[in-house]
C-alpha cells in the first residue's frame, strides 16, 4: 500500500470517508483540511437520481449564490444599441458585436462569462467551436441568452454559477472559498440544492438527491447526510 503524504495522513485522521456527516460539520471539516497556501475553492458533487442517457432527464441551469463565489468575474456581452448601453451600466467588462467576435476568433478571451442578446445570436452562433469547448457558449437554459442583458450581467457579477449533469448524472459546482464562514457556505449550498430540486425532470423516478459530498481543492472530501440539508 502506498505511503500517505503528511497532508493526506492529516486529512485521513480528521475525515472518515465511510461516514455521513451533518452538512455543517462536513463543511467545517473541509475548511479545516484546506491548508494550502492559497484560498482553496470549496466544491460540491451531487449524485442525482436520473438516467443521464435520456435527454429529457438532463439537469442544467444556473443559480445566484447568496454569499457569492469569492471570485472576481469578468463578463463579456454581445449586444448593440440600448442593450449595449444597459450592459455597460450594469458593469459588463467587454461589450460589442462583430468587434467582440473578431477578438474571440483571434484568441483574446479575457473573460469568464459570455452573455448575448437574442438578436446577436447570428454572430455568436458562429463562435460555437471556440466558446463551446470552454463552457462559454451563451445558452437560454442558464440565462446567458436573454433580452435583459443588464440583469444577466448583475447576476454574473453577484456570484451566479452554472450547473449541468455529467455523463454519470453528477452535478459538480463550486460554492465558495475556504476563507468563507461555514454559514456562508451552507447558505450557498442550500441555494444550489434548492435550484436542483426545482429543476427535477418530470421523468426522474425514485430518490432524486442520491449522494452529496463537499471537498476543497487540495484538502479532504466529506460525505453529507442528505437529511441534514432540509434540517437547516
From Swiss-Prot:
PROSITE patterns associated with the record: RIBOSOMAL_L1
Q: Which GO biological process categories is it annotated with?
A: regulation of translation; translation
Classification via InterPro entries? Ribosom_uL1_bac-type, Ribosomal_uL1, Ribosomal_uL1-like, Ribosomal_uL1/biogenesis, Ribosomal_uL1_3-a/b-sand, Ribosomal_uL1_CS
The record's Gene Ontology cellular component field reads:
cytosolic large ribosomal subunit
Q: Name one Pfam family in it.
A: Ribosomal_L1
Q: Name one GO molecular function term.
A: rRNA binding
Provide the alphabetized UniProt keywords: Repressor, Ribonucleoprotein, Ribosomal protein, RNA-binding, rRNA-binding, Translation regulation, tRNA-binding
Tell me the subunit arrangement. Answer: Part of the 50S ribosomal subunit.
Q: What does this protein do?
A: Binds directly to 23S rRNA. The L1 stalk is quite mobile in the ribosome, and is involved in E site tRNA release. Protein L1 is also a translational repressor protein, it controls the translation of the L11 operon by binding to its mRNA.
Family of the protein in this entry: Belongs to the universal ribosomal protein uL1 family.
Protein's name according to its UniProt entry: Large ribosomal subunit protein uL1
Which organism is this protein's natural source? Answer: Bordetella pertussis (strain Tohama I / ATCC BAA-589 / NCTC 13251)
